[in-house]
Amino acid sequence: MANYTAADVKKLRELTGAGMMDCKKALDEAEGNVEKAVEALRIKGQKGVAKREGRSAENGAVVSVIADDNASGVLVELKCETDFVAKGEKFQAAANAIAEHVAKTAPADLEALLASEIEPGKTVQAFVDEANANLGEKIVLDRFAAYADGYVSAYMHRTMPDLPPQIGVLVELDKPNAEIAKGVAQHIAAFAPKYLSKEDVPAEVVESERRVAEETTRAEGKPEAALPKIVEGRLNGFFKDATLLGQPYALDNKKSVQKVLDEAGVTLKRFTRIKVGI
């Protein structure tokens, strides 16, 4: 039996996140040398990373970091395989560390984020791979948003009380208004609009909706002369449902979101909604 103590096992677990039996086995093989045991477990963990590549990661957390002056903010999704891992402190600490890194560095895109150094000599990709190895599940970082051109606010929604936030919304206004920012972000979390405004809907999507409206109207046997008016009405209904500014405001459904913003004298410049796994 190798010469090591319970304290060595505890230390190794804290350093690697590996299970107790794996730590004991590694210490046995390393003859009680903690550093060699750490190296052995990390090598074993990296082999496990490769094995987990084909597995699905549909659980996880959305994390936000907002500057004290609301001049900037970020939203980051980190995914894992099970809600058990998502609830854990180590997973949530990893997600928070990545979000703080994004807030400090403002990477241009995901590729730049993964290649950036979150710690001296360690890229974000290596950090994620290390979490993968330590937690024993596939860990995926593939979405984030970073705003820094207005008044930025976030709303985080928990779908289950014992889980970290599963839905996150980041909004950017042209001027400070905490009440409107919060209300609109809550609306976005609940109603999941696909686009900000009518002008943001891609032309091919509009044409597809128009064709569906025309075919549906004809199938209903409506007069051909009435077709254009009916189709436009249905297309406007699509815009009302699919665009944030066209939707009835969640906190006052007698007004559209656009009307609420106009009355407050603010412009919503952009938004991002992230729901874990979707």
Swiss-Prot record:
Residues 82-85 are annotated as: Involved in Mg(2+) ion dislocation from EF-Tu. It holds the Pfam family EF_TS. Disulfide bonds: none annotated. It comes from the Bacteria. Gene3D superfamilies: 1.10.286.20, DNA helicase RuvA subunit, C-terminal domain, Elongation factor Ts, dimerisation domain. InterPro entries: EF-Ts_dimer_sf (IPR036402), Transl_elong_EFTs/EF1B (IPR001816), Transl_elong_EFTs/EF1B_dimer (IPR014039), Transl_elong_Ts_CS (IPR018101), UBA-like_sf (IPR009060). It is found in: Cytoplasm. Keywords: Cytoplasm, Elongation factor, Protein biosynthesis. One of its GO terms (molecular function) is translation elongation factor activity. NCBIfam families: tsf. Belongs to the EF-Ts family. This is Elongation factor Ts. It comes from Streptomyces avermitilis (strain ATCC 31267 / DSM 46492 / JCM 5070 / NBRC 14893 / NCIMB 12804 / NRRL 8165 / MA-4680).
